[in-house]
Amino acid sequence: MNYKWNYQPPTLQEREAARALSREIGISPILCKLLQERGIHSAAEAKRFFRPQLNDLHDPFLMNDMDVAVERLNLAMGRKERILVYGDYDVDGTTAVALVFKFLQQFYSNIDYYIPDRYNEGYGVSKKGVDYAYSTGVKLVIVLDCGIKAVEEISYAKEKGIDFIICDHHVPDEVLPPAAAILNAKRPDSTYPYEHLSGCGVGFKFMQAFAQNNGIEFHQLTPLLDLVAVSIASDIVPIMGENRILAYHGLRQLNANPSIGLKAIIDVCGLAEKEITMSDIVFKIGPRINASGRIQNGKEAVDLLIEKDFASALKKSNRINSYNETRKDLDKNMTEEANKIVDNLSDLSERRSIVIFNEDWHKGVIGIVASRLTEIYYRPAVVLTRTENLATGSARSVSGFDVYKAIEHCRDLLENFGGHTYAAGLSMKVENVPEFTRRFEEYVTNHILPEQTNATIQIDAQLDFRDITPKFFFDLKKFNPFGPENHKPVFATLNVYDYGTSKVVGRDQEHIKLELVDKSRTTS
């Protein structure tokens, strides 16, 4: 794919503001310009950005229904009611379930957890899950990373005398489920100061409120922050505001003293001797946790994440790692098949979206294939497979285009859907696939901007080699953890040439090692 470089030189006013901030905090004006692009304009704001403090976390009781949720949880514990912690089968859901279960289990024993089966139940709260809760005497379900659209299922549970506390971060519909409490900063009536928490992050805020209400010291929550960091990185939520605080301290926990389960995954990933970054979570830790729900059942991931014995955790981690190897093989084969289908589309050059359907594809991998298609063809992609009488699938998008709104536009054709700006899940009757394909393409064509269909590399700053000093690199590392809204900066140096020693390296010869010359100065 050919990428277009996009660079907007700073204005005179921006350069002057960057130099002023540079004098105030003592770092390069180039990096100060990056700070200003992140909304940081003073020394005090820079200090909070570079050294996030847990004391700056928002009061959890600012979230709508938090007082009701804590009161209902306290009531359940006081009555000795059976509690079920229920969550989605992806990384965000399984880390959320592990976090809430591990914390509450310290104070209460009549508690269990449940992860729905991707293939038999599908995403979110299922009637089968409600029936399991009822059959085991559960009176309160804490549902994490899903539930905000489960009006029918939670109504069904209410008829059986089961209350729900929803901890979700997905966009709600106009009608909310009849739950005892709904914790979701994306509620239209939300007064919470930050709306981009992960599902696990919402679970953490619930436990923070519970601890606060019951006189439990905050330091008892900090060992759980490694799970929050894993969820933030894996669910690709913004890493600014409250998420930056949670991710920063979660990474410190992950590197200094990870939970037994995560330590086992770290060992299997070959990360035991290095400093773990958000990229390591995205590309190594997260996919292994996800593989459990993709290939088998997400409950195995929770079993691992709450494990207290390292030898047992290592066995479970190795088993999940084998699922990940299976996942990679499926991913490779399905992506090759998908590419052939797309390349043979007669109108590919005119299309602004991709929708493909194959009855035989593995449901657990279609989201990855959709991501691959988006990267290769640089347009929103929906990949569908057949589950019983429904076409179920995943959608992924390009930068700047809201694929959730595109899917919502076709909601009358759908049985179920949910997600975020850049990723969503959906299901429909098989006979609706052609009309969905037409309507989805129509919406994308009418709403996507020309620049959103071109692969671009956004250049953050132009610099000379002499700007790259040890102090520059040291200060740049302070921008960690990187992620959405705090991406890794891309720098450009112009008028350089190859010194003549370049060579291709790497297992698949996918990298190049070279010396470049810039104004008679060399680097390698």
Positions of the model-derived regions?
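Accessory interdomain/linker segments of ATP-dependent helicases and helicase-like nucleic-acid enzymes
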Residues: 459-523
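Hydrophobic helix-and-loop "lid/oligomerization" segment in the mid-to-C-terminal part
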Residues: 2, 10-140, 160-161, 211-435, ...
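Acidic-glycine-rich active-site phosphate/pyrophosphate-binding loop
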Residues: 75, 171-184, 516-521
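Generic beta-sheet signal
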Residues: 114, 144, 167-169, 183-185, ...
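Short alpha-helices
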Residues: 99, 177-216, 221-233
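Intrinsically disordered, low-complexity regulatory tails of plant transcription factors
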Residues: 150-151, 235
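Short gly/pro/ser/thr-enriched loop/turn and capping motifs at secondary-structure boundaries
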Residues: 119-121, 150, 170-175, 189-191, ...
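A common structural junction motif
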Residues: 411-415, 443-449
